[in-house]
């Protein structure tokens, strides 16, 4: 039987679903729904009436000088949650299901968003082909965090390749800031 995709816009409409991933849960959907400036949407893939995967996206408004209709941003954490155990072992089928959900999300979110961003992908190569098919592109991002208990010779802790990456980043406009509080 073909895959059926259902999009939920309101928490009261979402049925109880199996799964343990907090980033694609009904609970997080309800939190986004109650938060001003956020509009969540949950895509659930079902096969033969049983849920096999889900993907939660949050559309947020940025409070900038531009009109809010121009600066809506859709964020998805990881590649979704696969509820069917057979998808965990069959990567090709998992990518096919993810590709269908990604295409559906792209159609839904591109109506109101300028940017759709996937963060914290578990495997950077998972779904690469379907991302490219849907006109997504990778962005190189380097975040370096180190505990600096002793301030002497901090550079000695970095490998030569990490030092090259940092120098290249600084040359290309990256900023280095020292954290003074826990919040930073």
Where are these regions (language model features)?
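Short, solvent-exposed polar/charged micro-motifs at secondary-structure junctions
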Residues: 15-16, 126-129, 184
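Amide-forming acyltransferase catalytic core, primarily the GNAT-like/NAT-type
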Residues: 1-79
């Amino acid at each position: 039987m073909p895959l059926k995709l259902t999009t939920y816009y309101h928490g009261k409409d979402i049925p109880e679903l199996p799964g343990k991933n907090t980033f694609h849960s009904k609970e997080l959907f309800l939190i986004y729904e109650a938060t001003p400036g956020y509009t969540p949407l949950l895509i659930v893939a079902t096969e033969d009436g049983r849920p096999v995967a889900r993907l939660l996206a949050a559309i947020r408004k940025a409070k900038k000088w531009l009109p809010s209709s121009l600066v809506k941003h859709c964020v998805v954490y990881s590649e979704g949650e696969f509820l069917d155990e057979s998808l965990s072992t069959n990567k090709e089928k998992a990518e096919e299901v993810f590709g269908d959900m990604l295409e559906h999300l792209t159609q839904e979110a591109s109506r109101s968003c300028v940017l759709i961003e996937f963060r914290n992908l578990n495997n950077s190569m998972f779904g690469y082909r379907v991302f490219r098919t849907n006109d997504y592109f990778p962005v190189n991002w380097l975040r370096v965090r180190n505990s600096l208990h002793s301030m002497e010779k901090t550079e000695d802790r970095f490998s030569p390749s990490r030092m090259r990456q940092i120098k290249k980043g600084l040359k290309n406009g990256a900023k280095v800031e020292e954290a003074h509080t826990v919040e930073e």
